[in-house]
């Protein structure tokens, strides 16, 4: 049996430094003092904060390290040009090439303490190349990192030919979550139809939901309202996530705070991508210029589950990113003004 003891660990909820005993890679005991055999390996943490592994709940592993790809440059720095550039350059991607880039990104995240990743896989591709690559990666790395995969229609569920069918096929192949992008659909009716379809598929296949929702400065982009209502009706709010919801930062306060009640009732989860959205949003603004984030502080203060994520690592949407969630957190709590006394 392999034993290892860590001493002088600073743990949340403990006033004193603690010792941690690990046996065969499993945490066995936490106490102020643990007696072990003389040959047990001991590592002194020197009073450093010791935390569980991080979760990156929103990233696109099929996109990573493509920012310098021929034709992928996003000159306007907007969400919509990013999608256009991706659409124009993704046709020559292969399973092996996607996996090689994704493994590099996963290693970066793991080196920064991440052990759980939810990645979106673009299924607006008749060959489903990205999904196949990430399903293989998930299995190959299962002993290192836990990966969830979202069947995600980057170019729209109804604005891309057979997008809804491709999302469903992705679920049949093994994707864990149903994705959508209602604000990118050609019209509001298509966006609403896509939300209904997302919920229908989630119920049919007993899958989680994670929708790119209202990633826009447009205060009339309010698809999260429909997603919330349907999650309440179906009783699946805790299994449902709304990612981005940037437009909540642009709507008037009376609407936002009315919605807080429904968000709370539904149990809906929210993901904000602070480094990504402060970069992408507000591009049509002069001044004042919006920060582009959802109402992180208000969601948190209302007891609604909200978290931060990396989203991109050097792709057509965001030229930076290194998988360090502490950098994302640092930016998030500053941009969302969550450090006020």
Model region roles, listed by residue range:
Residues 10, 208, 229-240, 276-280, ...:
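His/Asp/Glu-enriched, well-ordered alpha-helical/loop segment
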